[in-house]
Amino acid sequence: MSDTTIAIRSEETKPDYAEQSGAVNLASPRLGANLLEVSDEFFGSRTRMLEDAPPVFYPDRYDDHGKWMDGWETRRRRDGGNDYCILQLGAKGTIAGFDLNTRFFTGNHPPRAKIEATLTDDIPTNTTEWFELVPESDIAPDSQNQFPVTD
């Protein structure tokens, strides 16, 4: 039996901030969103981070790096640094909030996250000014971690 015949798909809920504002997913690959840089993608490719469909779990799927997961997954940091990604949104717009989805990531989810943004048409550099949109916050495993943005 192929692992594609036994798939568990999660049910996702649209956050209140998105329902109320009629928000569009600015991080959608269909709009042209692109991941410019990631600190590591050993266990899960960056391309799995921007899927429009809800995450899926295949109990018996493995690849060259171990258990296949439907999301971006890094090796654990041992050098004191942080894992990060730089995402270019698919369109300019007002950000209503974020959904950091850890569905099916139970012991391998990030414990915390912080989200910063910049408005630029160029690739960010060391001198780029970043603005905090979501302060460092705890992230729950196997969940939609939703963070509305108020400013």
Question: What residue ranges belong to the model's regions?
Answer:
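A short glycine/threonine-centered beta-strand motif
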Residues: 89-91
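Trp- and acidic/polar-enriched beta-sheet ligand-binding modules for extracellular glycan
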Residues: 2-84, 105-151
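General structural concept
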Residues: 85-87, 96
